[in-house]
Amino acid sequence: MKIVFMGTPDFAKTAFERLCDNKFELVGAVTQPDKPKGRGYLLMPPPVKEAALSHGIQVLQPQTLKNEEFKNDLKRLSPDVIVVAAYGKLLPNYVLNTPKYGCVNIHASLLPRWRGAAPIQRCIMAGDKKTGITTMLMDEGLDTGDILESSETEISDTDNFETLHNRLSMLGAELIVSTLRKIENGKRENLRRKQSNENTTYAAKIEKSDCVINFEKSNVEIFNTI
């Protein structure tokens, strides 16, 4: 089963490395372009690019997914499934419809709670006691596709973004291996279940205004924000 991996940051790199370790047939990695960082504004590669190159896997870094060159590259790679983890851009319909088994997203929440860009931060800020990872078949909506598998973890009072991010990245790596093995064995439709639209919450991108402490809030709310 040929796999194209689409992801950018460390969260995605953890899953990518796990797929390599488990000998999945990764035929390409799609990631964001290199970006300038630091005082010298030197171009730095995304973590997924570094991992892919270390394994000898072709890297694609399109500025936009709508250009003809990338469309042709994806068609040439002919993936059976595309795995998506924190890629950073919405996927156009032709990408969603390219692979035989669809695009499988590793999302860092227990959907339908915390659909959107910042599920880890938002669950901490809301004082949630548990969260997890969901693997889902992507559709045109924002994290609205059919759920394949999920795995939970508790959130302790001592957790912060870093500790929870690291735990969820490991959990996501484990879960995507499980999901892909079942897809390989023809069990995708057995896993597939419609995602409920009840009790939905949205994890909007963290803005500067979210980082301002409102001292009129309770001590618990202030602690969770920090």
Predicted segments with their positions:
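N-terminal Rossmann-like dinucleotide-binding module
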Residues: 1-40
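Donor/substrate-binding cores of folate-linked one-carbon enzymes
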Residues: 22, 32, 81-202
